[in-house]
Amino acid sequence: MAEITYPKAGHKVVAKGLEMQSDEKPCVISCGILRKEIEHLLEKGDIDVKAHFLSERLHNDYNLLDRALNGAVKKHRKQSPEGVIVIYGDVCLGFNGEMKKLIDKYDVVKVDALNCIDCLLGGKGKLLEMDPDHKFLFLNPAFIKFVEKIKGQTKEKTREMFSMLDGIVLLDAMGDLDAYQSKIDEIADHTGLPILKRKNIGLGGLNDVLLEALDRNQQKRSES
């Protein structure tokens, strides 16, 4: 777990007409899968927040992620008078409303997205527009590292695990995907999945998702 902030003397950021002093920042609690992209947005000054990242490995176990996320929200809610924004998807804790229960429990704001990939695409279910039947394996640099663990399985077993999918869709948000080509080829070979397409998505979708959540957080605070 790690927390970072990018203080900028005298700097102000405006999101949809809402102005915030740099020393009064909300805290975002995010999956580590989005760390590189969020840090880049912070460095550019597109968003102005404190950022706390949980390990992407927690995705392997709903219970571990639930405990870690509960602990992080509880801690940072007390320490962040400007509010907390959770950057996890609706289904990251399960498919029975578990994430909504956590958000309601602490009365904080969450990004409008199904999962991390949906965040990168712009949220609001855009993932389902691209993959309505859940037939694609989406890979960006963070997910390439995450999926690489399948190499511990035999090729036969791995291909059986992924046999319900049609293929791989590559997502390049940072313009660095070419550096991972050998790893992409290894994953394609091990899973038996063809590479169907590559989308150079940039960071605009993620930035929009974050600004919309920051806007809702500010409105929530102004109404309280």
Predicted regions and their residues:
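Short N-terminal or domain-adjacent regulatory/targeting segments
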Residues: 1-20, 143-156, 212
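N-terminal basic/disordered segments at the start of proteins
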Residues: 2-45
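Glycine-rich, highly charged phosphate/nucleotide-binding loops
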Residues: 62-76
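A conserved mid-domain beta-alpha-beta active-site/ligand-binding segment of alpha/beta enzyme cores
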Residues: 130-185
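A short beta-strand-loop structural module common to alpha/beta enzyme folds
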Residues: 48-66, 197-200
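C-terminal, charge/polar-rich interaction regions
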Residues: 173-224
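Gly/Ser/Thr-rich loops at beta-strand to alpha-helix junctions
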Residues: 28-36, 58-59, 87-97, 117-118, ...
